[in-house]
Curated annotation (Swiss-Prot):
It catalyses: D-glyceraldehyde 3-phosphate + phosphate + NAD(+) = (2R)-3-phospho-glyceroyl phosphate + NADH + H(+); S-nitroso-L-cysteinyl-[GAPDH] + L-cysteinyl-[protein] = L-cysteinyl-[GAPDH] + S-nitroso-L-cysteinyl-[protein]. Signal peptide: none annotated. The lineage of its organism: Eukaryota, Metazoa, Chordata, Craniata, Vertebrata. The modification S-nitrosocysteine is found at C150. The record marks H177 as: Activates thiol group during catalysis. This is Glyceraldehyde-3-phosphate dehydrogenase. It comes from Columba livia.
């Protein structure tokens, strides 16, 4: 059983904790968040507007957060180097504040006795791993890793299957992405990215994303062959990737469906899924897959030029991969 500490009890921190409880392979033993006190943690964990009421018990007792009878040590440190992870028995730390995303900043957790740190965001310099794509390249000399982004986790498994079977010459990705916490409820100031400051509930907002370029880091053969952008739309959760790419080998759309289904039923089971149903975004709320290929939504212009569509729960699917990555890392100890 992997003993885990969570730094930052936001959307991902809370859902990694939910996913950990369901997985029974990792145990959250400590949580740090300087902005949320213990009683508020109970409330935030218990009630979730997107994923519903927690189906278990959660209470505050003796200064700890007790979920389903398991007591979790609570810290409220602003400086990650001051968190005494070892005292709480936490060996792996999920860095989910969105703030400490570099090797140097995330490395502060090691000072408190953590053995490994998993950054739940893309990182400028930490090695990135996507389950089902390049997780086998992880080796135990690495103390700090990144689980990449939710969008990279959706795109990379699909890109891998297509590239392995037909070869991707080049491609452009668009993600139609649900609202996230960094956006504004109404128009407000937003640094250099002026569009990002516009009201999230009333606009379709074009935004940048490094998710497609990051695929080149986890699949080196695709480095420089993919880039992409995002449209932020007024939905609370679930996003969809549109990968438009040129294929090296000719392929009928039915050939593409066949290889994706084979991967979803085989080596990528649990990570990539396949559907021919007439689905919409809400149908994937609470889905634990990284990516669900929508066979009915894709189109082909010809045998070399296709548009492929894949859905993802950008909160819960991703949180499950964070747990899976920790389990995989622990298997290499």
């Amino acid at each position: 059983m992997v003993k885990v500490g969570v730094n930052g009890f936001g959307r991902i921190g809370r859902l990694v904790t939910r996913a950990a409880i369901l997985s029974a392979k990792v145990q959250v033993v400590a949580i740090n968040d300087p902005f949320i006190d213990l009683n508020y943690m109970v409330y935030m964990f218990k009630y979730d507007s997107t994923h519903g009421h927690f189906r278990g018990t959660v209470k505050a007792e003796n200064g700890k957060l007790v979920i389903n009878g398991n007591a979790i040590t609570i810290f409220q440190e602003r400086d990650p180097s001051n968190i005494k992870w070892a005292d709480a028995g936490a060996e792996y730390v999920v860095e989910s504040t969105g703030v400490f995303t570099t090797m140097e900043k995330a490395g502060a957790h090691l000072k408190g006795g953590a053995k490994r740190v998993i950054i739940s965001a893309p990182s400028a310099d930490a090695p990135m791993f996507v389950m089902g794509v390049n997780h086998e390249k992880y080796d135990k000399s690495l103390k700090i890793v990144s689980n990449a982004s939710c969008t990279t986790n959706c795109l990379a498994p699909l890109a891998k299957v297509i590239h392995d079977n037909f070869g991707i010459v080049e491609g452009l990705m668009t993600t139609v992405h649900a609202i996230t916490a960094t956006q504004k409820t109404v128009d407000g100031p937003s640094g250099k990215l002026w569009r990002d400051g516009r009201g999230a509930a009333q606009n379709i907002i074009p935004a940048s994303t490094g998710a497609a370029k990051a695929v080149g880091k986890v699949i080196p053969e695709l480095n420089g062959k993919l880039t992409g952008m995002a449209f932020r739309v007024p939905t609370p959760n679930v996003s969809v990737v549109d990968l438009t790419c040129r294929l090296e080998k000719p392929a009928k759309y039915d050939d593409i469906k066949r290889v994706v289904k084979a991967a979803a039923d085989g080596p990528l089971k649990g990570i990539l899924a396949y559907t021919e149903d007439q689905v919409v975004s809400c149908d994937f709320n609470g889905d634990s897959h990284s990516s669900t290929f929508d066979a009915g939504a894709g189109i082909a212009l010809n045998d070399h030029f296709v548009k492929l569509v894949s859905w993802y729960d950008n909160e819960y699917g991703y949180s499950n991969r964070v747990v899976d990555l920790m389990v995989h890392m622990a298997s290499k100890e």
